[in-house]
């Protein structure tokens, strides 16, 4: 959340029904050929026009960059000066209550700092968003609509909010364990039990969100944080900048094109009204990555990537799939089904035998595998763009750049070409 022009923003939802923030201080299954007709002859069409924890003990080293610890380059100002610079941007009400410790992330219109409550010495994170910019305001409003309503162990918690005419300061719990993405890259192997433990926590959070009428719409390993660096850490869902929040009884269908290409559901690609089942598709992709270190759908060419997704075309060839249990594959298959009506719900996924048994029927051995070049490339680009050497984070404010987002224009062109082929 927070990159200035990197996201297609969601439509604003209706009024929310619950506010659990402590305080707000205002300014004084089926065959995967549902879209077979859509992707016919797509090969004849040219490519579509294209258009922060930072390092932790689990974050992979940046390729080609020597590990010199956290020593700042000579040109970098002293840490105290940097902290003072950002402290000056904070409303006096905030600094009277919280001691600004370090900048831990930034985006085009947001900054995230690690702070300490002056009275209790409890650490928190504060996200400062520049709401004078339209996109910053819209993303902020979207995230607040969700965070003011939720209280769940596996969802990032909002503590309080301070508002001025040009900025919003969101005080949030601090997660220090890094992203799931980083552990996937650095760890190199997971047992099936490891994977089911992660998925149980994420599914429980998603089930809770869906029961409230909230659809995340951008679930991926980068948006799943470990609460602390230990192996027994819980997982926290974060980054609700693209989320849709609706009251019970409202129309549950959404139309906004948004998300990250490799995790986007087929029905979004064809610009059909969709439901919260898009989150379940993304969880299928995440499960596949956890077990194999590769993505089920990946291609540098967006047209070919979208074609794979529309067909639900993925395979279990090569390592480590011969060592993966049939129950694990069945779990993935029931999520990566092109027909959203046949996809498992979060509750059904939690009750799947593989998850319930914590993969008891699997061999419990590490699934040794090489990480795909796609994931390594993404990790490398993120290393180069990381702005902080701290290992603490709350809610992401950067990481996803323009090239990693689904673009409305791309899908308009994709649909136009389909219509021309279909009508011709």
From Swiss-Prot:
Residues 381-398 have a biased composition (Low complexity). It is a lipid-anchor. GO terms for molecular function: ATP binding; protein kinase activity; protein serine kinase activity; protein serine/threonine kinase activity. Keywords: ATP-binding, Cell membrane, Cytoplasm, Cytoskeleton, Endoplasmic reticulum, Golgi apparatus, Kinase, Lipoprotein, Membrane, Myristate, Nucleotide-binding, Nucleus, Palmitate, Phosphoprotein, Serine/threonine-protein kinase, Transferase. One of its GO terms (cellular component) is centrosome. A lipid is attached at residue 2 (N-myristoyl glycine). It is found in: Golgi apparatus; Cytoplasm, Cytoskeleton, Microtubule organizing center, Centrosome; Nucleus speckle; Endoplasmic reticulum membrane. The modification Phosphoserine is found at residues 380-381. A lipid is attached at residue 3 (S-palmitoyl cysteine). Residues 59-79, 378-408 are annotated as: Disordered. Autophosphorylated on serine residues. Gene3D superfamilies: Transferase(Phosphotransferase) domain 1. GO terms for biological process: determination of left/right symmetry; heart development. The active site is at residue 218. The keyword Nucleotide-binding applies. It catalyses: L-seryl-[protein] + ATP = O-phospho-L-seryl-[protein] + ADP + H(+); L-threonyl-[protein] + ATP = O-phospho-L-threonyl-[protein] + ADP + H(+). Residues 98-355 form the Protein kinase domain. It comes from the Eukaryota. Activity depends on Ca(2+) concentration. Its EC number is 2.7.11.1. PROSITE patterns: PROTEIN_KINASE_ATP (PS00107), PROTEIN_KINASE_DOM (PS50011), PROTEIN_KINASE_ST (PS00108). Serine/threonine protein kinase that may be involved in the regulation of pre-mRNA processing. It may phosphorylate components of nuclear splice factor compartments (SFC), such as non-snRNP splicing factors containing a serine/arginine-rich domain (SR proteins). Reversible phosphorylation of SR proteins may cause their release into the nucleoplasm and change their local concentration, thereby influencing alternative splicing. Belongs to the protein kinase superfamily. CAMK Ser/Thr protein kinase family. Homodimer. This is Serine/threonine-protein kinase H1. It comes from Mus musculus (Mouse).
